[in-house]
């Protein structure tokens, strides 16, 4: 269900088109509820659940992920249906007591990799997905309708009735929520390759039913930290606007060569989108001024985000500005040299206060390909 009133997802990511919290019900001889929803939509979720159940009662609640945006209503639904069993893995139940004050000892169904749960015509097979993006995460494959319940995998920002391309907000969601855990996503993709999947049901965003190879290929690219497109992100952090003017001029010159260029003002634009574009393209230009002998904080914050999300396999060039002792490039370079497989482009462009004819960007326009 949609939440269009939320301002920040995880209290940090802007979601102008809201977000959805997806919960599913499998109706069969036995009934399984697949996850709950955020506390923000509790009343609506229970109303939808009761409508789906009619005069029947659920047999199982399957807990794919304990994060509160999906699990906030576990205790309430368990109390509403006292005969319902709770399905999770060992890590699920180890963590559950940290969130809820309810004794589920006699109601637990503990599952592991490859275990099956028959509902009648439908059968769930459990696929462990640790650290995608919490340690207890698991997915479920339903073999009759060939559905993968993918937890946070293949999710995106945006309400379900938002008319927008899947890729952009799915990419922003992936790199900012799951991006650090590429190896773990790769492991799950290998498991999924052995399944006959016709539908993917994530916990956020639309159900995917067509051209599934497109979405899986995107996840394979993203989780292997390979560039999705050839292009350059010019990211700037400017105090009084002079560094930004230089960065904008550079972006214009790069575009004139036929290169795809994205631009972000780190002082004003969405940080999550800057992270997204950094991973999308194969090259990055960092433009920042020196501040109190260090890096201007918006740029330093950006580099912290890239480090946290395991940014790698890219080329990076540097533009620095300083009125008396420019050191930003040296310090930015010291940070990114700690990233995996990064090529630092030389020479550094140094600006003293304002741009003038002595500053050359020629070296940054070449090579036009990674």
Which functions belong to the PLM regions below?
Residues 29, 40-87:
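Active-site metal-binding motif and surrounding structural segment of the metallo-beta-lactamase
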Residues 248-262, 338-341:
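Short helix-loop-beta junction
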Residues 267-343:
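Helix-loop-strand module that forms the ligand-binding subsite of alpha/beta enzymes
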Residues 34-36, 59-66, 87-89, 148-151, ...:
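Active-site neighborhood of phospho(di)ester-bond hydrolases with catalytic His/Asp-centered motifs
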Residues 1-30:
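Zn-dependent metallo-beta-lactamase
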Residues 361-368:
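Conserved small/polar residues in nucleotide/adenosyl-binding loops
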Residues 88-210:
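Metallo-beta-lactamase
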């Amino acid at each position: 269900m949609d939440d269009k009133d939320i301002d920040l997802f995880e209290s940090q990511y802007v979601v102008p088109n809201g977000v959805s919290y997806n919960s599913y019900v499998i109706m069969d001889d036995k009934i399984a509820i697949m996850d709950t929803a955020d506390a923000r939509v509790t009343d609506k979720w229970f109303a939808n659940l009761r409508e789906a159940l009619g005069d029947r009662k659920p047999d199982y609640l399957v807990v794919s992920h304990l994060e509160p945006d999906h699990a906030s209503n576990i205790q309430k639904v368990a109390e509403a249906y006292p005969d319902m069993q709770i399905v999770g893995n060992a890590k699920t139940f180890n963590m559950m007591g940290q969130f809820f004050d309810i004794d589920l000892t006699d109601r637990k169904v503990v599952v592991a990799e490859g275990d099956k749960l028959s509902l009648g015509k439908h059968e769930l097979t459990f696929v462990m997905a640790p650290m995608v993006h919490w340690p207890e995460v698991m997915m479920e494959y339903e073999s009759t309708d060939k559905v993968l319940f993918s937890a946070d995998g293949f999710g995106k920002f945006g309400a379900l009735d938002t008319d927008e391309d899947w890729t952009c907000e799915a990419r922003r969601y992936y790199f900012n929520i799951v991006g650090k855990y590429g190896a773990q996503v790769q492991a799950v993709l290998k498991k999924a390759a052995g399944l006959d999947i016709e539908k993917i049901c994530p916990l956020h965003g639309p159900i995917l039913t067509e051209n599934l190879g497109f979405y899986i290929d995107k996840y394979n690219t993203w989780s292997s930290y390979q560039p999705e497109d050839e292009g350059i992100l010019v990211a700037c952090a400017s105090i009084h606007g002079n560094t930004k003017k230089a960065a904008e001029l550079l972006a214009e010159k790069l575009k004139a060569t036929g290169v795809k260029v994205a631009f972000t003002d780190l002082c004003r634009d969405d940080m999550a989108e800057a992270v997204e574009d950094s991973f999308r393209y194969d090259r990055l230009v960092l433009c920042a001024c020196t501040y109190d002998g260090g890096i201007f904080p918006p740029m330093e914050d950006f580099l912290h985000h890239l480090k946290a999300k395991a940014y790698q396999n890219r080329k990076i060039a540097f533009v620095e500005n300083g009125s008396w002792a420019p050191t930003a490039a040296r310090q930015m370079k010291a940070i990114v040299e700690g990233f995996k497989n990064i090529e630092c482009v030389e020479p550094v462009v140094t600006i003293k206060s304002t741009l003038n004819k002595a500053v050359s960007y020629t070296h940054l326009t070449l090579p036009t390909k990674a």
